[in-house]
From Swiss-Prot:
Location(s), subcellular: Virion membrane
Protein name as it appears in the record: Large envelope protein
Keyword annotations of the record: Acetylation, Caveolin-mediated endocytosis of virus by host, Fusion of virus membrane with host endosomal membrane, Fusion of virus membrane with host membrane, Glycoprotein, Host-virus interaction, Lipoprotein, Membrane, Myristate, Transmembrane, Transmembrane helix, Viral attachment to host cell, Viral envelope protein, Viral penetration into host cytoplasm, Virion, Virus endocytosis by host, Virus entry into host cell
HAMAP family associated with the record: HBV_HBSAG
Record's keyword annotation contains NADP: no
Keyword presence, Chaperone: no
Ranges for region Disordered: 107-142
Highest taxon of source: Viruses
Pre-S: region residues: 2-202
């Protein structure tokens, strides 16, 4: 039957017409009171039509008789129960409505009609049979079931969805007009819509992604060369400590492999000093990583993001352990508090210092184990109080060691700049 409507009639009964769906069921009076509620359908007396033309004529006349301006239509808030969905009696006759547009007068230019007719085949004209069309994906299985009971169930479910105001506005496309009734139409079973999803993603890389990848590779290569340069300069400085008069040529020559003259900081793999050179550079790399870790810890400690509990708390407040993730002052931002000594579901909450919690903790830990560090406290306080003298001392040290540091510091400049940016923006 394609997508044409199936309309069922009985010679001696009345056809109950369901609005906004386009399917007719025969009944003298609503047999199923739980489903066919009074007032939600239109009725008309039909003489049993013998031909398709008579059926079309009766439907058109019925449309013209309905006063669409005063018709209340399908109640918006009507809820249909999902019980007693019996199909029409088997004695009813089934006719198929041929496609023919039916325009309802009085409706705001809402198109009413049926699906276009199917293209006739060439099987009866002596030509070769038309190859069968591959079946389309069934997107509305509840509308095409052969079992009429399940068909009626899907019909009632779809009818309930049409009773909401949102579906009415989406159907008519006029958000500024209040359409309380759903205008009845004779329409076919909805055909599978053409699915228009997102466009397929192109497997090719976009220009912006390619530029970002190239820029990232360039940054990695730059940092790697700088790290190698830093390791080479530190290796040179380390080796120079053993030779105050200057670094001589490498004496670790291998008798089996003749190597040219070179410095101890650039030994080839065939030289006996090659393993010692890379051992020194491995230690240098570990020291650089340790320096970065210390910088990160100092930064987090200065921001107050390290939850380190003090050794000797000054204030105590007993709160519930589950709520001990906030500070004593009921602040939901760092610093947090520490929960110790849980007893009977409660604990002692000690506030963490706002900054330098790790430094204070390490200093207190060192003082508890090395009492002689207490002697340095007055000296440190004195150095902090005479900042001018400390500045002069620092200037003098830089002036004395400046020429020697100029050959070592340039490779560190990018790392210093990176540390400064991290310190400022984090």
């Amino acid at each position: 039957m394609g997508n044409n409507i199936k309309v069922t009639f009985n010679p001696d009964k009345i056809a109950a017409w369901w609005p906004a769906v386009g399917t007719y069921y025969t009944t003298t009076y609503p047999q199923n009171q739980s489903v066919f509620q009074p007032g939600i359908y239109q009725t008309t007396s039909l003489v049993n039509p013998k031909t398709q033309q008579e059926l079309d004529s009766v439907l058109i006349n019925r449309y013209k008789q309905i006063d669409w301006n005063t018709w209340q239509g399908f109640p918006v808030d009507q809820k249909l129960p999902l019980v007693n969905r019996d199909p029409p009696p088997k004695s009813a006759q089934t006719f198929e409505i041929k496609p023919g547009p039916i325009i309802v007068p009085g409706i705001r230019d809402i198109p009413r009609g049926l699906v276009p007719p199917q293209t006739p085949t060439n099987r009866d004209q002596g030509r070769k049979p038309t190859p069968p069309t591959p079946p389309l994906r069934d997107t509305h299985p509840h509308l095409t079931m052969k079992n009429q009971t399940f068909h009626l169930q899907g019909f009632v479910d779809g009818l309930r969805d049409l009773t909401t105001t949102e579906r009415q506005h989406n159907a008519y496309g006029d958000p500024f007009t209040t359409l309380s009734p759903v205008v009845p139409t004779v329409s076919t079973i909805l055909s599978p819509p053409s699915t228009t999803g997102d466009p397929a993603q192109s497997p090719e890389m976009s220009p912006s992604s390619l530029l970002g990848l190239l820029a990232g590779l360039q940054v990695v290569y730059f940092l790697w060369t700088k790290i190698l340069t830093i390791a080479q300069n530190l290796d040179w400085w380390w080796t120079s400590l053993s030779f105050p008069g200057g670094i001589p040529e490498c004496t670790g020559q291998n008798s089996q492999f003749q190597t040219c003259k070179h410095l101890p900081t650039s030994c080839p793999p065939t030289c006996n000093g090659f393993r010692w050179m890379y051992l020194r550079r491995f230690i240098i790399y570990l020291l650089v990583l340790l320096l970065c870790l210390i910088f990160l810890l100092v930064l987090l400690d200065w921001k107050g993001l390290i939850p380190v509990c003090p050794i000797q708390p000054t204030t105590e407040t007993t709160v519930n352990c589950r709520q001990c993730t906030i500070s004593v002052q009921d602040m939901y931002t760092p610093p947090y508090c520490c929960c110790l000594k849980p007893t009977a579901g409660n604990c002692t909450c000690w506030p963490i210092p706002s900054s330098w919690a790790l430094g204070n903790y390490l200093w207190e830990w060192a003082l508890a184990r090395f009492s002689w560090l207490n002697l340095l406290v007055p000296l440190l306080q004195w150095l902090g109080g005479i900042s001018l003298i400390a500045w002069f001392l620092l200037i003098w040290m830089i002036w004395f060691w400046g020429p020697a540091l100029l050959s070592i510091l340039p490779p560190f400049i990018p790392i210093f700049v990176l540390f400064f940016l991290i310190w400022v923006y984090i």
